[in-house]
Amino acid sequence: MKSYACVLFDLDHTLWDYEANAEETLRELYSRYRMEDRGVTSFRYFLETFRRVNLDLWDRYDRGLIGQEVIRTERFDRVFRETGVEDTRGSMDFSATYLRELPQKKNLLPQAREILDYLHPRYPLTIVTNGFEETQFAKIESAGIGHYFAHIITSQRAGSKKPSPKIFEFALAQTGHRAQDAVMIGDNLQTDIAGAADAGIDTIFYNPGRSIHQATVTHEITHLQELRSLL
């Protein structure tokens, strides 16, 4: 088994449980903003619409088709419209509240804290994330995992975003390690895995849903605890 000198991690959907935290936040806001009084038929419909719209916007962002500001301004405007809210003028206030409260949630993916406890004494750990600068740091602080990481690299700080090799090269420059001595762990085949591979970095694809794919990965896991046998 190859030995590594440093480990890079994605944050959302790999360590920080975005789906659970988003649902928790949206459930609170759905009630606070009285969305059923505004024409939404159910919270489940609202949540499913959000997930679809959010996935579409982040996919477009990752492909370089839109900027982060478009996500901020369009996400809940679209959700409101598609769930039957006639007056969408409150969507920006809803969005601002969501962005403020979401990062305060603390849910991590199963076994995330345990594997960080295991890896932290053995490797310098670094986060590499495309998320908003202010929200990503708040997520890490709220979840109580900041002390595990020597570096937290956001796309804003690096001046480039995954899957560009430049963000990985920036991260390696901060750590002082070479690409061949690093490994990237993430859940997204395009941004995390293909991006790291293009930078010459080995990859570990975190695939808890066991999705079928044809991508080339160095290793693949379905549970974070499997990292113990690889690192």
Residue ranges and their predicted role:
Residues 12, 30, 61, 123, ...:
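Generic low-complexity, intrinsically disordered sequence content enriched
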Residues 2-110:
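N-terminal helical cap/lid subdomain that shapes the substrate entry/recognition surface
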Residues 60-62, 100-101, 121, 152-154, ...:
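A short, structure-level motif marking secondary-structure boundaries and short turns
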Residues 1-7, 20, 113, 117, ...:
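Asp-based, Mg2+/Mn2+-dependent phosphohydrolase catalytic module
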Residues 35, 81, 104, 118-121, ...:
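Secondary-structure boundary motif
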Residues 53, 121-122:
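Structured helix-beta-strand junction loops
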